[in-house]
Structure formats: structure tokens, C-alpha cells
Amino acid sequence: MKFFVDTADIAEIRELADTGLLDGVTTNPSLIAKSGRNFLEVVEEICGVVEGPVSAEVTALDAPTMIEEGRKLAKIAKNIAVKVPLTWDGLKTCKVLTGEGTMVNVTLCFSANQALLAAKAGATFISPFIGRLDDINLDGMELIHEIREIYDNYPALETEILAASIRSANHVKDAALAGADVATVPPAVLKGLAAHPLTDKGLEMFMADWKKTGQKIL
């Protein structure tokens, strides 16, 4: 599974990129607005920090303007994935931009039917929102299973399942078990994947025993 971080915080992105485990970044206008900086400047800076896909979202709602915005975003860097909403205009935009060689992330997916349409439109990524479905008492993870099964039925479909709206480490684990190709995760949740109380307890014990020996490696 690939790990993307869902943030526009440059410091957080640099810290996670330094681990060598970060495969990409997803952003949206809300995340970038929190930085108080120019949208295009932030996106360009992120593209310079990570080599993998950086999702940057259009803000228009009609296909002609989405396409124009998408082309402008794609010029920022080769690793831009233009993010478009799962609407008919978004699907039209996806078809055009992917035809021009631009990566496209189709976002706000809440059904398997939507995911099938996105794949037909040539989407590089489809972003089903797990947490938001859970919020309305639907099974967000079941959607990942459904999309995986449909895509596997048609090997010609190359769209990657990008699990989004992830709230917890269990969401990440369950998405991996369901066959998601990518999980985009908030920084705190991503860092928390390495945490376990027994790991901490074991490390404390090892260090206490080592200290008693009076030895050093360096």
C-alpha cells in the first residue's frame, strides 16, 4: 500500500518525506486556506518536497473552467494530480486531462457506481470517502471492497483506489485488507501507525537491561 499524507503543512510534509515512507500528498482548498498563503505557491512548494503525486483541486464547477484550471495546475510540476469532483462535469474534465497525459484524482466518491464511471473516464485515482460514510451510519469500508471487486473484474481498468477521509489507524488497516492501493492519511494518524504501548514497554525494558551492562556501541 502507498501512503499519501493529507495536509498542506510544508513542515509536516518535509518531516514525513524524510522517513522515505511517503509516496505522495493530497491537498484541497480548505487545507491550503488554513496556511494563509497563495494557493499556487503552496502547491509548487509541496511538489518540490515530494517526488510522488501531489493532488491539487480545481475550484470551478463547470467542465470548461475545470479543464482550464486543471491545465494550469498541471503546468506547476510533472507530479501534479489534478483533483476533480465526481460530477458529470468532473468526469468530462477527467477524460480530457488524462487524454493529455495529466494524472487525475476523482474525489468525493461515495458509491461503487461512481467509482466505475471514474475508471471509465480514465481516472488515475478514485477517492472514496470512508469516514464521511461512517458518519451517516453507512459502511465506508464496504465501499472499498465493492470497488476493488469491480475493478478486479475488468483488468483493463487501471484506476488506483485511494482511500480517503481516514480517521484512525484501524481505517488504514481495514483499507489495506480491503485492497485499497493508496491511503491518504492526516499527519497525526500516519505517525500513529508506528505506535503501540507494548512497543514502548519493550523498549524501556531493553534500554534498562542494556544500561546495566555499562556498554556502548559507539
Swiss-Prot record:
Enzyme Commission numbers on file: 2.2.1.2
Keyword terms of this UniProt record: Cytoplasm, Pentose shunt, Schiff base, Transferase
Cell compartment(s), UniProt: Cytoplasm
A GO molecular-function descriptor: transaldolase activity
Matches recorded under SUPFAM superfamilies: Aldolase
Keyword Cytoplasm belongs to the record: yes
Database matches in InterPro entries: Aldolase_TIM, TAL/FSA, Transaldolase_3B, Transaldolase_3B/F6P_aldolase, Transaldolase_AS, TSA/FSA_arc/bac
Signal peptide: none
PANTHER family tied to this protein: FRUCTOSE-6-PHOSPHATE ALDOLASE 1-RELATED, TRANSALDOLASE
Stated role: Transaldolase is important for the balance of metabolites in the pentose-phosphate pathway.
Name the UniProt record assigns to this protein: Probable transaldolase
Gene designation per UniProt: tal
